[in-house]
Amino acid sequence: MGSLRGLRLVAGSCFRSCERDAFSSLRLTRNSDLKRTNGFCSKPQESPKPPDQHTYSHRVPLHKPTDWEKKILIWSGRFKKEDEIPETVSFEMLDAAKNKVRVKISYVMIALTVAGCVLMVIEGKKAARRNETLTSLNLEKKARLREEAAMKAKTE
């Protein structure tokens, strides 16, 4: 029992000394970040250079639009005339304009689909009044094919 207790005491003191050495090399700075000092001379940290005034602050890459992309920018309502479009535009602006045009085209396609459905219903009702149903058309076609087969059999 005594040796176990002594072993625990030695291990505890060893742990405390290691802990003390580790925490003495770490100190809190004003920004409350842990900073390790290892006893060597350290260079003072340099502040990052301020960005140039000539570059964009968001660092957005710019793109020179083609004629087709200029038309898309006009169709989307972003610009009124082609003269108003700047020489370079951001990719985000182009994507937003393309998405608007896609939505407008999909609305047109939906309207054309609905108009086509209504037109087919009207044409179907007109054909039903003239008794041009699919059943009657199929029966006429089969009768005509039978007659042609009978005529062919007689000639042979």
UniProtKB/Swiss-Prot annotation:
Keyword Mitochondrion: yes
GO terms for biological process, alphabetical: cellular response to hypoxia; neuron apoptotic process; positive regulation of apoptotic process; positive regulation of release of cytochrome c from mitochondria
InterPro entries on file: DUF1075
Keywords linked to the UniProt accession: Apoptosis, Membrane, Mitochondrion, Transmembrane, Transmembrane helix
Keyword Coiled coil belongs to the record: no
Region (Disordered): 37-57
Main subcellular location: mitochondrion
Subcellular location: Mitochondrion membrane
Topology in membrane: Single-pass membrane protein
Disulfide bonds: none
Residue stretches spanning the membrane: 105-122
Region of interest called Required for proapoptotic activity, as start-end residue ranges on this chain: 78-104
Cited Pfam families: DUF1075 (PF06388)
Recorded GO CC terms: mitochondrial membrane; mitochondrion
Family: Belongs to the UPF0389 family.
Protein task: Proposed to be involved in regulation of apoptosis; the exact mechanism may differ between cell types/tissues. May be involved in hypoxia-induced cell death of transformed cells implicating cytochrome C release and caspase activation (such as CASP9) and inducing mitochondrial permeability transition. May be involved in hypoxia-induced cell death of neuronal cells probably by promoting release of AIFM1 from mitochondria to cytoplasm and its translocation to the nucleus; however, the involvement of caspases has been reported conflictingly.
Oligomer status and interactors: Interacts with HSP90AB1; HSP90AB1 is essential for FAM162A mitochondrial localization and pro-apoptotic activity. Interacts with VDAC2; the interaction is probably involved in inducing mitochondrial permeability transition.
Official protein name in the record: Protein FAM162A
UniProt lineage: Eukaryota, Metazoa, Chordata, Craniata, Vertebrata
